[in-house]
Amino acid sequence: MNALDIEATRRRLEEADGGYETIHSSPGLEIGVYVLIAPEPDRQQPHEDDEVYVVLEGRGVLTIEGESVDIVEGKAAFVPAGADHCFTGYEALSVIVVFARAHGPTGDAGATPS
């Protein structure tokens, strides 16, 4: 089992004025830490994978396909693959990002049935 030092990653990104860093990657899963610091905008594009955000610190608004929801520490939000989404209304926002990648019948990410 690999321990993931989420807090150290969050602090490092905060000191660098924000950004994203992957802390785990395997064929079906990516986990990262994303830190947004105003006034820098969230410039995300839709992703190929389903995604879950878990708020570590801060608050803001997450808009998914035109619907907005307030997010605060301890809350989570699901973003389906391909959905337009972005964070707004934050001062400093830190989230854990979990990308769930599709597995084919052999367990390989992105594999398709024969």
Question: What are the residue ranges of the model-derived segments?
Answer:
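A short, N-terminal "cap"/entry segment at the start of jelly-roll beta-barrel domains
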Residues: 1-33, 40-43, 108-114
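Short strand-coil-strand connectors
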Residues: 27, 65-67, 90
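Short, conserved beta-strand element in jelly-roll/cupin
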Residues: 47-62
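A cytosolic small-molecule/anion-sensing beta-strand core signal
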Residues: 56-57, 72-73, 91
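Short acidic-glycine-tyrosine-enriched beta hairpin
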Residues: 66-81
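Ligand-binding loop in jelly-roll beta-barrel domains
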Residues: 81-106
